[in-house]
Amino acid sequence: MGEEPVPADKALGKKFKKKNASWSIEESEALYRVEAWGAPYFAINAAGNITVSPNGDRGGSLDLLELVEALRQRKLGLPLLIRFSDILADRLERLNSCFAKAIARYNYPNTYQAVYPVKCNQQRHLVEALVRFGQTSQCGLEAGSKPELMIALATLPPPLDRQDKHTKPLIICNGYKDQDYLETALLAKRLGHRPIIIIEQLRELEWVLHISQQLNIKPMLGVRARLSCQSLKSSEISSGNGDRAKLGLTMPDIVTVIHRLEENNCLDCLKMLHFHLGTQVSDIALIKEAMREASQLYVELVKLGAKMRYLNVGGGLAVDYDGSKTNYPASKNYNMQNYANDIVAAIQDACELGQVSPPILVSESGRAIMAHQSVLVFDVLGSNQTGFSEPHPPDENAHPLLKNLWECYETITAEQYQEQYHDALQLKTEASSLFNFGYLSLTERGQAEQIHWACCRKIFEITRQLEYIPEDFQALDKIMTDIYYVNLSVFQSAPESWSLDQLFPILPIHHLNEKPSQRVILADLTCDSDGKIDRFIDLWDVKSYLEVHPLENDGNPYYLGMFLVGAYQEIMGNLHNLFGDINVVHIATTPQGYQIESVVRGDTMTEVLGYVQYDSDDLLEGLRRHTELALSNGQITLEESRRLLEDYEQSLRRYTYLS
């Protein structure tokens, strides 16, 4: 659905506090590292709000707070995923531009074609937008399953009118294949498509040869190689390569493919060499080494008589989630131009040395294309502050342990905080033991723990002022963090965070001209202990807390944003505790501001319950029977039963998240 353009300066809700004289947006920039991971798309404006520049360096920005409040006025509840179509277009354009520059730099006598791996994010609006943006650059699609092949065939327009058969958009057919998959891929050639079937198991070759003869369609084939270079064996991506890789052919397997194609007079069908390092390769050295091996393999295949045309380097182009520009798993020690340069240079050198024609270059850089375009915005529902309440001194007749703890609390100073800290720990342990053996009441134990946490907070405030924090006290950073309860499900909206320890930039989208005085972890709506985020980006390490602002009792929401979540998160999300898909909105920039391209409403309770085979009418009827029985037994009044049934029926139509 489209809407009228909204001027960027007319959006609702400019509820800004005055700038804190002791804090600046430059300090927020340094703390949250927005420029390091977000440039050129995300920044902080003078009002202390996050801005989004969907066109990157070409200018024009939107105030994210104003956008969120305008969307909420349209009855779009949080959590809310905002997709910026122009960022998607810009990422694809940048990738093509980097390879064009590399090709010009090295005088490479061939071209580059991007291919989007549908598995990265299969959402229809995104795939259709990418195909539209990629028409001029012949961007193709990669399918790793039969359903993804269905998407590719129906979404990518058949290039019937294009003369150069080698620059048509490609459909790369990866993954496990049965005979139906292969038949569909082969028949797609009749539509004018250019499907390349990647042989990843030897049995697939026999099926392709048999089906292609039956259909009288000459196949276009590729082989996926298991690279075995030394650095891959010790790296985090080794599971996708080497002798024990899940998919791909060993060197003996590839030789067998060559011989079988020769025997069937089909060696000219082999067109592509493909390898895949992973979706997030942080170290450029791994890419360099893999390219050396793959380039030499390409040359050898040509020398064996294969009519090779493409080198598909797969995925691996990483996203710098923490902005550190290192080989840490959440970062990368290279940029997109370095990546393109190294790929072009490696195959150029190998082909010149081997005296073979250089191939068309192909990459499946899904994460790098998709990650930046989506921003997840959610609100904070409440907090739990550790050791925040002021303790009361124990009575004269109180247990001696309580008196000792209170003395410890009162005598904490910057000069002797270490001794008091260890005393407080010991007394807390003693309190637990005394309670377990019945020598301390529940009330007394509660008071003991309250004083203990007050001691810890007092000591924590002292250690925060130190240039060097002794090792014994470094754990206080984690122990003394508060909990902010947030309106989302980590399992649904950030599954890589809990399953793979993936880091995403998270920060307030407003109040960034004020000092964030609270250190917190985030707890989601689920009743699972894993439903939390307690790892946050930092320059040198992973932080165990996020700096945020105190919650105000002024009725205004406090918004947090999770950035770079456009790749994999939506499709990997699950229905833990039956929290369903969230509201999604697609935003495009206009000369006047922005326009809502489409809205995808999140799951209602009826829809989520249907996923687990519950019918809402049956549920409502079941509750009605229970209320009628309760009415007849005098357990509930008629008015109460009416209200219960009305609330139940209305709830079934509502969003699964809190309003």
UniProtKB/Swiss-Prot annotation:
Q: List the GO molecular function terms.
A: arginine decarboxylase activity; metal ion binding
Instruction: State any GO BP term from the record.
Output: spermidine biosynthetic process
Q: EC number(s) per UniProt?
A: 4.1.1.19
Question: What cofactors are annotated for this protein?
Answer: Mg(2+); pyridoxal 5'-phosphate
Database matches in CDD domains: PLPDE_III_ADC
Q: Which UniProt keywords apply?
A: Decarboxylase, Lyase, Magnesium, Metal-binding, Polyamine biosynthesis, Pyridoxal phosphate, Spermidine biosynthesis
Q: In the record, which positions carry N6-(pyridoxal phosphate)lysine?
A: K119
Looking at the UniProt entry, the stretches that span the membrane are none
Q: List ligand-binding residues for substrate.
A: L311, N312, V313, G314, G315, G316, L317, A318, V319, D320, Y321
Pfam families in the record, alphabetically? Arg_decarb_HB (PF17810), Arg_decarbox_C (PF17944), Orn_Arg_deC_N (PF02784)
- Which reactions are catalysed by this chain? L-arginine + H(+) = agmatine + CO2
Summarizing the function annotation, the protein's role is: Catalyzes the biosynthesis of agmatine from arginine.
The similarity annotation says: Belongs to the Orn/Lys/Arg decarboxylase class-II family. SpeA subfamily.
Q: What is this protein called?
A: Biosynthetic arginine decarboxylase 2
- Which source organism? Synechocystis sp. (strain ATCC 27184 / PCC 6803 / Kazusa)
